[in-house]
Amino acid sequence: MTKKAFLVLEDGSIYPGESFGYEGEAYGEIVFNTSMTGYQEILTDPSYAGQIVVPTYPLLGNYGITSSDIESSQIQVSGFVVRQYCEEPSHTEVTGTINEYLTSQEIVGISEIDTRAVTRKIRSKGVMMGVITVNISPEQALQQLKNKPSYDEQNFVQKVTTNERYQWTESGLGYDHIADNLRILVSDYGLKYNILRILKGKGCDVEVFPSSATSNDLLAQNPDGILLSPGPGDPELLDHLVTTTEDILGKVPVMGICLGNQILAKSLGAKTYKLKFGHRGANHPVKDTASGRIYITAQNHGYSIDPESLPSDVTVTHISMNDYTVEGIRHRSLPALSIQYHSEASPGPKDNEYIFDDFLEMVKETK
């Protein structure tokens, strides 16, 4: 028999539903994602650490869980809120249901929620903390929530980064080998596997380092380039990553994605700020300021670069066509570029993988 469950927001809003996945309590920042597919990639994206994710699409789990759709070693979200989930998925590679997947990793979910009503709340009020509760009352859960640290107070990068450096060997399919034998190091702030697949597929020698690696640790490897990965949390808490990036700028080409974009910007003297409800979905239009071309991008971020704080030697290369926030920057003289959206997609459109080519061409030019 299905147990009752409740989604409780920090403003006191209570949404009754039914438990699925693991039965317990889950605390986190409530965010919504507008993607229609790709739920397994979303669940395993480390950038969602500390967050309870609300997909706006009403039916989740219809193609089940597969071994090929993971973006990290485990589920990363704190909780999952859905309107409805499928108990009998259909897929040639299915290994289980979404309910079984959440249960096996002790991730709390709630179904039968009006997810679009929750989304409207977040759009109008902004992101806020919340809790999914199964075993205690909504009133008790709200009281416990008040004693939990806010999302912005927690360093999630140190929770999701790798503990040890490792070589990546799995190659993505269908890529031109434009970068044979280029040695690329990836600083793991909470990376997705598809970044590594793309780099390897293009011919790179790829090694991943923990976020605690110093500039000396990285430069001692004599890399041809360094990629600053996506990741969760507030960049204001990550001064050590900014310092490390400052130390490597000008010594080796650098590319940043999402959180890596914010870290690069801060290392160049810019400031960041929190968005009201962030950008999370697979259909965000972004304009390339040089060509004027519009790309549809996958996004997952809650912070952005303050364009007024960018120094004069940094140019804005991409902007959001939804709210005109900064979506990419490039230094005018140093070999450094970054983007706010997810060029690796997973899930989402692959139109923007050309950014990896731009980075690798920059690396080859500086060798």
Model feature map: region roles:
Residues 108, 183, 253-255, 271, ...:
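Proline-centered loop/turn at the N-terminus of a beta-strand
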Residues 114, 258, 301, 342:
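Active-site glycine-centered loops adjacent to acidic/histidine catalytic or metal-binding residues
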Residues 292-334:
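Catalytic beta-strand/loop cores that center a nucleophilic Ser/Cys/Thr
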Residues 224-225, 229-296, 304, 348-366:
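Cysteine-nucleophile active-site neighborhood
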Residues 1-216, 221, 235, 346, ...:
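RNA-binding accessory domains that recognize and position tRNA/RNA substrates
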Residues 183-188, 297-298, 337-341:
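Active-site-proximal beta-strand elements of phosphoester/diester hydrolases
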Residues 85, 231, 334, 344:
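Flexible loop residues that form catalytic
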